[in-house]
A protein has these predicted regions:
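C-terminal edge-of-domain segments
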Residues: 1-15, 121, 125-229
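N-terminal short leaders/motifs
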Residues: 1-17, 60-72, 108-117
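An N-terminal domain-cap segment
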Residues: 11-66, 77
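A generic structural signal for short beta-strands and their flanking turns/coil linkers
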Residues: 39, 54, 61-63, 81-85, ...
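Short helix-to-loop capping/linker segments positioned immediately adjacent to catalytic or ligand/cofactor-binding
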Residues: 42-46, 99-101, 117-122, 142-149
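General beta-strand recognition
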Residues: 64-66, 86, 160, 169
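Short, structured beta-strand-loop surface elements
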Residues: 71-132
Length: 229
């Protein structure tokens, strides 16, 4: 993932966090760290008058997010048409267990990006974008795996989305209980969520003795420490 060119996302009305604004962040370091750790984005747009939200893998290069899919995909066609896009990612860090059901919550980190998609037509940018997406999923993987051939490139569409209207929002707190509930004989606190990757499982065509790369054996997502409140 390349560093962004700007230090702060542009503040717009729709990207401004109003509910718990103290949990918001607009600096690109925070936004980029969350984008670089997450694996799946939920991309919302309107297609033929109806709202649609699709989960997609992605990659980030500087100030640009890249999405890809089949060139016959209605989703990619809609994103390439200049439709307004809402791109979101969420990382769950803990379950927040309060003394009342009303005050149960989640500790999380999230990013919302607004913008319009751009169909990538330059062949060199398209190849870089596809490499960016693969490297986002498993850093170093493009050194081992075959590059896409001409027919695979022709069958794939790539959409670019500039990160120029975005916000991050996070919660990293214990339960917030009413004073009257603090004496209840009910356990309260946080239950941390840890994403774990198991040992690699080779498919049946892997040659005997061929071991996975160290980047696979010791695979972990980049992790930014949640902000303390």
């Amino acid at each position: 993932m390349e560093a962004s060119d700007t230090g702060t996302s542009a503040l717009s009305d729709r990207a401004t966090v109003r509910r718990h604004p103290e949990r918001a962040a607009y600096d690109r370091a925070t936004i980029d760290a969350i984008l670089d750790e997450a694996l799946v984005a939920h991309v919302g747009f309107v297609r033929e008058g109806s709202p649609v939200v699709i989960p997609l893998s992605y990659g980030r290069s500087g100030d640009t997010l890249y999405l890809h899919g089949s060139n016959v995909s209605r989703t990619l066609g809609a994103l390439a048409s200049g439709a307004d896009i809402c791109f979101t990612v969420t990382l769950l860090d803990a379950l927040v267990l309060a003394r009342s059901t009303f005050h149960h919550s989640l500790n999380y980190r999230s990013v919302v990006v607004f913008g319009k998609g751009r169909l990538v037509t330059d062949p060199a940018e398209k190849e870089r974008a596809l490499e960016c997406i693969v490297e986002h999923i498993v850093p170093g993987r493009t050194r081992d795996a075959r590059e896409p051939n001409a027919s695979e490139l022709a069958a794939t569409s790539v959409i670019a989305l500039t990160i120029d209207e975005a916000s991050a929002k996070s919660r990293n707190e214990p339960p917030v209980d009413l004073a009257a509930d603090l004496t209840r004989a009910t356990w309260a606190g946080v239950l941390p969520i840890v994403q774990h990757y198991g040992p690699p499982i080779a498919d049946s065509f892997v040659s005997a003795g061929l071991e996975p790369a160290e980047t696979i054996v010791s695979y972990e997502r980049p992790r930014a420490v949640p902000r303390e409140r």
